[in-house]
Amino acid sequence: MPLFSRPAKKATHLFFATDVHGSERTFRKFINAGKFYKADVIVMGGDIIGKMAIPIIREADGHYRATLQGTQQHIETEAELDKLTERIGILGFYSKIMDEDEYRALAADESAVDAMFHELARARLESWLELAETRLAGTGIKCYITGGNDDYPDVLEALNKSGTESVLACESKVIDIDGQHTMASLGASTPTPWNTPREVTDEELGSMIEALVEQVDDPSRCIFNFHDPPVDSTLDTCPMLDWTTDPPSQIVKAGQVVLYGAGSKSVRQAIETHQPLLGLHGHIHESPGIMKIGRTVCANPGSEYAEGILHGVLVNLADGKVQSYQLTSG
């Protein structure tokens, strides 16, 4: 009698990156990574908007000036202006050209500054979504994007645009990514010294996680795409900061910067309890790596967005198992 075996399930190639913080070059690399790595699914794990807006002031003589990273820039030609705006975009900042009167009025109105920032952030995110739809059209690659703790809810609303084929919102959802595996996504984080828009207590984060996991049929086939990494996992190691100074300063003892695990206890507890297939994390830029908590492979690719470098992790999944994984950089 011939022997029969179950046909092997097709592997799913997943590419994950995070914390691009508005960087035009880094996000474009992320979208192109799908084809480059022959991925079926690409996931952007949060902190997608930039950190500041740079006014470019049009002077009476037709020249421009701007202050970037503490240095005043004097621009005389359109070519120089294009080069400056490109550099600002690579750094993850936004820019807006304005005359002296508009600049003075803006400087005197904090609410107007906030409104301008949100408008610029949403416009860039919308342009990214259009770019992704164009680049991924016809490839079969699915792109999932979630926010992080730095991302304002009103800006993230752009992700909920209907009618998209390749780019799909996944925040606070459990989604089927390939017919074999699901992904649960959360972008909030525990408190930071910077009082970012989407911070919650560790206890609140734990409640959010458990409410989401209740929707998961089989955690062993689920990816936990949680922006905050598990505490004391080597994926969350960073300098300890003094929150009483402005800006927060590194704590030094015996001439050495004090390092600690800044991740979430609730994220770690959820992974230990539910033992998902895979944990995808970010938030702590300087702590890239891959480790295991029980059976669960956990990864944080890290981030050097301001240099235009895309760090990622490429994972091959099949039939509820992680077949292979590799950190990438480019």
Which positions does each model-derived feature cover?
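Core catalytic region of metal-dependent phosphoesterases/phosphodiesterases
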Residues: P2, T26-D178
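Binuclear metal-dependent hydrolase catalytic cores centered on His/Asp/Glu-rich metal-binding motifs
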Residues: G179-I223, D242-W243, Y260-G263
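Active-site-proximal beta-strand elements of phosphoester/diester hydrolases
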Residues: A11-H21, Q180-T192, I223-H227, V297-S303, ...
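Active-site-proximal segments of metal-dependent phosphoesterases and phosphodiesterases across multiple
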Residues: S111-A123, N225-Q275
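Proline-centered loop/turn at the N-terminus of a beta-strand
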Residues: K142-Y144, L168, T182, R221-I223, ...
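Binuclear metal-dependent phosphoesterase catalytic core
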Residues: P2-F4, G22, V174-Q180, T196, ...
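Divalent metal-coordination and catalytic microenvironments
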Residues: D19, F27, I42, D47, ...
